[in-house]
Structure formats: C-alpha cells, structure tokens
Amino acid sequence: MAMHDPHEKNGPDAVESRVQTDFPVERFGGNGSPGVRRIEVISSQFNLVHRIIFFFGVFLIAYVYGLDGTIRYTYQPLATAEYQSHSLLATVNVLRSVIAAAAQPTAAKIADVFGRVELILLSIVFYTVGTIVEASANHLYEFCAGAVLYQIGYTSVILLVEVLIADVTSTRSRLLFSYIPALPFLINTWISGNVTSAVLKVTSWQWGIGMFAIIYPVCTIPLLAVLFVGHLKARRANPQAYKFSLLDQGVGQFFIDLFWYLDVVGILLLIAILALILVPFTIAGGAVTQWKTAKVIAPLVIGVLCVPAFIVWERWCPHPMVPFKLLKDRAIWGALGIAVMLNTAWTLQGDYLYTVLIVSFDESVMSATRITSLYSFVSVITGTILGAIVIYVRRLKPFIVAGTLVFMAAFGILIRFRGGADGTNHAGIIGGQILLGFAGGLFPYPAQASVQVASKHKYLAVITGIYLATYNVGSALGNTISGAIWTQVLPGELENRLGNATLAAEVYANPFAFTQVNPVGTPDRDAVILAYKHAQRLLCITGICLTVPLIAFSLCIRNPRLTKEQTLKEAEEIDDK
C-alpha cells in the first residue's frame, strides 16, 4: 500500500491518502471501484495550496446552494399561493423529500462508479434544468416537475461535498471540516431576507429562483478546477494506479452491471412506497374531505403493496440499496434513527412556519425570512465551536445526547409561542428558534460523523448516502404529517372562527393576499390568527412527542475515541464480520 509524501500532508489533521495497487480491480463497489480509487489518487497529490482552494471551492458551492435554498424556501409558499394551492405546499415538500431520499444512495453509488467530478457535473445539469422549469412554470404540476429535477441536483451536490470532506479528513477533525458547507448560513441568514425583499420589489419570485440557473454553475468552477488539476498530476505521478476501464467487458455488459449495482428496481420501489403512501395524506383534507375518493385510496393501496416487494427485492438483489450487513451495528442504526426523528420533528414545526410568521405574528417578509433561517445560523455557530472542541475531547456521544434533550426543550417553547403580533410573542418565537438551533449544532452533524467513522472508506459514500437518505425520509414523514394536520384542521378552524365559508376558503387558498387587506386588529384578521395558532400548536405538540424516540436513539449509539485516521480500526473489524 503506497503512502504519499508526508510533506504533502499540509491540512490540519488531513488524513494520509491510501492509494491501493495490490488488489484486483473490481468493476463496481469496494476500494476497487473507479470513483473511490480516483479520489484517493487525486487527494494524494494535494499540497497546502490545493487544499485551500479545495475547501474554498466547497465553501463557494455551499454558499450558493445555501442562499438559493433559503430564498427558494421563502418563495415556495408564494408560488403555491399564486396557483391558488397554498395548502398543497406540503405536497410539494413531500415530493422533494421522496426524490431526495431515493437520490442520496443512488448519487453515492454514482460517485463510487464514475467519480466525484462526474457527480458534480451531473448535479449541475439537474440543478440548472430544474431551476429553469420552476421559474417558468405556469401551473402547480409544472412547478412540481421543476422541483423534482432541482432536488436531484441539490441532493447530489449536498452528498458530494460531505463525501469529499470525509475523503480527505481524519475522524477527529471531520466534524469541524463538515461544517464548511454549513458556514454560509452565518451570512445567508441575514442577507437572504434582504435579497428576497429586493427581488420582490423589482420583479417576481420567478426571477428570484431563476437567477440561480446561472449563478450555481459558475460557482462550481473553483472546485472542479482543483480536482481537475489533481487528476492531471495523479495521471503523471502514478499512471498504473490510475489506469482502469469501465468498459473492459463491453458497453452492453457495462450497462447490465450498472443496472444491478445502482439497484434501479429498488430505487423505483422506494420512490413508489414513499410517494404513493405519503402524498395522499397531504391532499385528502381541505374544505371537503376526500378520503373516500379513488385518487386517495388507490395510491395508498399500491404503496402498501410495494413495501413487502421492496423488502424481498432488497434481500435478494446482488447490490442492495440498503447495506444490511452494516445496519446490524448500533453505531449505524442508532444514527439513522436520529436522522429520521430529527427531521420529522423539525419539519413539523418548520413546514408552515413562514406562513404562520406572516399571518399570525404579522412579521414582514424580511423578518419572517430571517426568523426561518435562525435555526441554521445558530446551529452552524454551535456546531463549528463543537467541532473544534471534539478535536481535543475526541468523543461525540455526550454532545449528541445533550443536543436531543435541548431539542425537546425548544419544542416546549414553540408550543407556547405560536402566534400574536405583540413583542412578547415575537421574542418568544425567536427564542424558540435560537434554542432549536443550539440543539441542532450539538447532534445532527455529530451523528453523521459517527456513522462515517464506523465504516470503511470503501463504504463511505454509500453509508453517507444512506444517512442523508434517512434524513430525507424524515423530511418526507414530517411533510406528510404536517400536511395532513394542516389540511384536516385549518379549513374547519377558519370556517368556525370566521363564520363565512367563502372567506375561509379564500384565506385557506391564499393567506398572503388576505393579510395585505386585513391588518391586525380587525375582527377577520384576529379570527384567522387564532385559527393558525391552533394548527401550529398541534404541529409542535406532535413534534415534541417525536423527541422521545429521538433521545432513545441517541442513547443507543457507540462512543468511540476518535483518532487521526480516516476511519477507525474498529470499523474495519465490524465490517469484516
């Protein structure tokens, strides 16, 4: 096993790259897969300058998709309201989460087979095309189609930057460097509201989304450039270790192997299960319940039938999407449980938060955008400080457990402060989001780091993809539950409090238009505020209930001592059992 020149290892706790030349080249999977071998060879050529450019490139990409995500999160309610379908906001979010859940493990395998650079290029295509479709959509279904394409690109690049960082860092420094993609939230939290307001003053939300079809591809250039330079140096320095072919057995056999390795059938079954079961819950409610209609019953039945088919398939197929061997370790399944419960609970309070801030708290667009970003802002500050502490403490579990307990306390505050235009409620919702963000800095990223250090490097991309997939499954579940509660509860509350079915339907379809002509203090606005407060209260109560299993999962994970190695020696032993 070749070790690169120690003088080249200039990053803080940078892991020594391991270029293997003494094993047979496998076509797919393992250390022999082209993507894994390629990044090991490339990173072995990095000096200090290359590493600085590398991390700057990661930061720049993260800055752009982070700003875009924050702004798009604000514009999405406006878009659905413009289509007179604001209540279907959860449906759009469920579709995005379903695609993200399926895309994560798929993108991880693509990164292993074809390479990290190729995944960046693929993400650019989907991100750009999806953004253009969303910005030019005239109907909700067109907007959803664009959101799905955008989500594939967005999901792929999020996975990629986390995998790249894990590729070149040690176990004890990984948490600190994992926060590089999150650092832009320190800036975006405060400027996103200004950008959102400025765009809406001079143009429409369509341009606010569409401009990133140009900005994002341009900002990927520095990272692509440094990886390309590493690629050229690697080919010159060690051509034998870099020499491999995906087509050595012919094009036809390659696509057959790729079909099995990517587990295409498993991906389709997973999408079918999540979409067909979860989406109906977000559309069945409303002013007139639709639970007995075919468009709700049929997808539910088909989705349920797909569950046993998925389990049987994953047990039988040669390259399952879910690596059952790894899931036997509580270090893995405990962290995956944290990911699901965390995002389910967070999404419950966050899905309609922007709308509640505008309608119930009477916040401005700028203020509402900033408040919805407070979680990310505070969690990044907390997590970055924690990452530096972990380098010396070398343990993760105590912080993860503490974070889940604080997370529960934050939900208690959010249940208390869920609406009202006075200063007390304004301070209360801000305090709740800050405490939620503090908790978010203590355990989501540490849980991801813990699942990475428990696996060999050859499983790194796949296990990171599985973790992020379960994260998005949590989002899908949260979106579904919030959408179901919102559509089942809010229409009746509005009608009861307003005493006018027509006005209630108008508010339900487009609450933002209603707030513009009905200021706080008018009878109708006060009635609407009470209705929205009631719905948000139910969402937050459901969320705090889910923090109980969240805490339980945090107690189940392992507490290994972190080292300067890329993975722990214990991980090698666990995976080989």
UniProtKB/Swiss-Prot annotation:
Disruption phenotype: Leads to lower ferrichrome (FC) and ferrioxamine B (FOB) uptake activities, which are reduced to approximately 60% and 50% of the wild-type activities, respectively. The keyword Glycoprotein applies. It is a multi-pass membrane protein. Its main location: membrane. GO terms for biological process: intracellular iron ion homeostasis; transmembrane transport. Keywords: Cell membrane, Glycoprotein, Ion transport, Iron, Iron transport, Membrane, Transmembrane, Transmembrane helix, Transport. It is found in: Cell membrane. This is Siderophore iron transporter 1. It comes from Aspergillus fumigatus (strain ATCC MYA-4609 / CBS 101355 / FGSC A1100 / Af293).
